[in-house]
Amino acid sequence: MFNNFLNMYMCTLAEKLCKFKKNNFNNIHRNNNFYRDNNFYRDNNFYRDNNFYRDNNFYRDNNLYTNNNLYRDNNFYRDNNFYRDNNFYRDNNLYTNNNLYRDNNLYTNNNLYRDNNFYNITLRKFHFIQTISNNNFNFEIIKKYGDVINKIMFIHTQKKNKQERFMFNNKKYIKRKEYILNDLNEFISIIPHPEINNEITNNSNQKKNKDNKQNVLSTNQQIITNYNLNHKENVTSNLNFNNKEEDEKKLDKLLKKRNIKKRDIVTITEEAKEELKKIISINKKENNNNYNNMNTICSDNHNDMNTICNDKNILKLFFITKGCNGLTHSFNFISKKDIHKEDEIIYDDQNNILLVIDKNCILYVINTTLDYYKDDLTEKFIFKNPNITSICPCGTSFHFSKKK
């Protein structure tokens, strides 16, 4: 009994399990279909949306492309029309301007031609001129206006009186006149008359004055050039003479400047000059005595005598370092060979060398006066040098400040 009950329970349990599995399978299948349907619907929507979006973009792009092309075509068409219209306008203006210019020229030429004819007709109408031949003119007039006289039309009239007369505008009779054409195509009487020729001559003179001014300038230039060419020799001779006079004046001035005595760097008083001459003469005597003595000693060897017996008779001024303040003036005898080219030389009245100043002392001795003092106790040379800045108490040495 228990077994039967157990089998029955197991069968029912098995049926329930089968139903449950079946339901689960159906649910799974149904769910799969639902998911698939949802995906399909969603995919369709996505595809449709994408197509719609793409179609919209394509439509928009096409519209943009067409609009751009249309805008470009419109611009091109507009530009072409504008360019064409401008060209047409310009061509029309050019055509109208050319026509206007041509018409104006034609109009002015016609007016000018008409006015000239009217002028000639009035002259013929109011001036009855007797026919004349070339023999009635002077030779000079025929020479100048021979070509023009042949072009003049003369009208012959006879009056009751045997005298030949001409009728004027105001119906007055005046004496016979002879007319010719001038360079400006105007009638001018050969015999001047104020009533006829004043107006014509005034107009012609105003036009000729401008030409005359230019001709006067050109003729003046030609006269000057011709004068210079014809009188070239006279002009050059005058210039050379003037140049010689100026050169002589310049030479005189230069010679006067050279003749002016150059001021020495050191001014020597008369007492100092006499004392320097005495010292130089004493030195020469001593040198001569020494020379005579050396002749007896150096008679056999002349080279030794020449080296020992050099003539040192020139007095030279220089500075030496001595004393408590630095420098002192000093003199020494040298020969002419020892004079340096940059040394300063002072001459006496007879152009003999009186004193030579060393090249290193020149800057410090400028404007110095050399004097000589002598009394019963002392005799000495005194230097009054403005360049010295300090002197020692004993007066033997001095000092210069450094120049900046």
UniProtKB/Swiss-Prot annotation:
Residues 244-289 form a coiled coil. It is found in: Mitochondrion. The keyword Coiled coil applies. Disulfide bonds: none annotated. Belongs to the HesB/IscA family. PANTHER family: IRON-SULFUR CLUSTER ASSEMBLY 1 HOMOLOG, MITOCHONDRIAL, IRON-SULFUR CLUSTER ASSEMBLY PROTEIN. This is Iron-sulfur assembly protein IscA2. It comes from Plasmodium falciparum (isolate 3D7).
